[in-house]
UniProtKB/Swiss-Prot annotation:
Its EC number is 3.5.1.18. SUPFAM superfamilies: Bacterial exopeptidase dimerisation domain, Zn-dependent exopeptidases. InterPro entries: ArgE/DapE_CS (IPR001261), Bact_exopeptidase_dim_dom (IPR036264), DapE_proteobac (IPR005941), Peptidase_M20 (IPR002933), Peptidase_M20_dimer (IPR011650), Peptidase_M20A (IPR050072). Zn(2+) 2 binds at residues 100, 135, 349. Transmembrane segments: none annotated. Pathway: Amino-acid biosynthesis; L-lysine biosynthesis via DAP pathway; LL-2,6-diaminopimelate from (S)-tetrahydrodipicolinate (succinylase route): step 3/3. HAMAP family: DapE (MF_01690). The gene is dapE. Catalyzes the hydrolysis of N-succinyl-L,L-diaminopimelic acid (SDAP), forming succinate and LL-2,6-diaminopimelate (DAP), an intermediate involved in the bacterial biosynthesis of lysine and meso-diaminopimelic acid, an essential component of bacterial cell walls. This is Succinyl-diaminopimelate desuccinylase. It comes from Xanthomonas campestris pv. campestris (strain 8004). Homodimer.
């Protein structure tokens, strides 16, 4: 017999919600949550669907945060089975979004239904917030909803994000923060010319090399609490026409910083601009701010999560701020304590993405226990 959470996960995977499409996932979830007594508000913006579902009223407000969109699967022929036709083989569920993060979303729904059935008059507010714009541009999703909440004065005390945080076994890692992410696209101007006449040209590669070397060599900080040190990585460099006898007229450099709470995007931008100015480069520089870092210090949410996960796993979880970015970066500035708890992440964004059925079926009880410890 198929469990409720497994069936719901399969129903969600079967909806090919490649970002920013939702493909009906949130409508399915809203129907279930409405039937359980949640008030559901659809906050669509452009091509992005967002769902805000609440049960109860007043403080404290606990949000279960997730996304219904998935990354593209690539050629279906590379998969052992259709990425949008969920299939269980040898106790493992395969399909795009199984781990990231339709399994967590399904577990949120089942846990929320069970919680309000057992505690219909619970203190505070239990909320579910979902978007179809986490894997893409992340502009019209939770970023937009957070701005709306700020305008409304919507309080959020605690936020549990269902991102796949576990490494080897379910619950072995508790994410207590994330680094900020800042990207830059630098164009250094030179003067094109023949390689035999360098005195008539200005090679932007040669001009930029000392500045790039300084950027790469710089130790931005020594880390912060659970954070590794700030890192700058050059991801792309392009110059030239493809001919080996032409000095290029410009150099294009793409880079990204993952940074600790020692910094914010504005101060990093100022530091890098000052460095480029010291090297007297002629350049343009465009920035993209993906999100500021957030960190949840020791407090109620972190303590409860550590105790619940420790009891579940049989050992205290590792508490980490590693990995990429998540939508919690938009909720944390509202004053919320934020953590991330979810399934094993070994197969996310890969061909044959999967989750162990046993892990999936354990998730609702894990989330429900967290909710009960916080709201009852």
């Amino acid at each position: 017999m198929t469990s409720d959470v497994l069936q719901l996960t399969c129903d969600l995977i079967a909806r090919a919600s490649v970002t920013p499409a939702d493909a009906g996932c949130q409508a399915l979830i809203a129907d279930r949550l409405s039937a359980a007594g949640f008030a559901c508000e659809h906050l669509r913006l452009g091509a992005v669907d967002n769902l805000w579902a609440t049960h109860g009223s007043g403080a404290p407000v606990l949000v279960l945060l997730g996304h219904t969109d998935v990354v593209p699967p690539g050629p279906a022929s590379d998969w052992a089975s259709d990425p949008f036709a969920p299939q269980v083989r040898d106790g493992v569920l395969y399909g795009r979004g199984a781990a990231d993060m339709k399994g967590s979303v399904a577990a949120f729904v089942v846990a929320a239904e069970q919680f309000v059935a057992a505690h219909p008059e619970h203190p505070g507010t239990l909320a579910v917030l979902l978007t179809s714009d986490e894997e893409g541009d992340a502009i019209d999703g939770v970023r937009h909803v957070a701005r709306l909440f700020a305008e409304r004065g919507q309080q959020i005390d605690w936020c549990i994000t269902g991102e796949p945080s576990s490494t080897e076994r379910l619950g072995d890692l508790l994410r207590v923060g994330r680094r900020g992410s800042l990207s830059g696209n630098l164009i250094v101007k030179g003067v094109q010319g023949h390689v035999a006449y360098p005195h008539k040209a200005r090679n932007p590669i040669h001009l930029a090399a000392p500045a790039l070397a300084e950027l790469i060599a710089r130790q931005w900080d020594d880390g912060f609490e659970s954070f590794p040190p700030t890192s700058l990585q050059i991801s792309n460099i392009h110059a030239g026409t493809g001919a080996n006898n032409v000095i290029p007229g410009e150099l294009q450099v793409a880079f990204n910083l993952r940074y600790t709470p020692h910094w914010n995007a504005e101060t990093l931008e100022r530091e890098i601009v000052a460095l480029l100015e010291r090297h007297a480069l002629t350049y343009t520089l465009a920035w993209h701010r993906s999100g500021e870092p957030f960190y949840t210090p020791e407090g109620t949410l972190r303590r409860v999560a550590r105790e619940v996960l420790g009891a579940f796993v049989g050992a205290p979880p590792e508490e980490s701020t590693g990995g990429g970015t998540s939508d919690a970066r938009f909720i944390a500035p509202l004053g919320a304590q934020c953590i991330e708890v979810g399934p094993v992440n070994a197969s996310i964004h890969q061909v044959d993405e999967h989750v162990r059925v046993a892990d999936l079926e354990a998730l609702p009880a894990l989330y429900r226990t967290l909710v009960e410890r916080l709201l009852v």
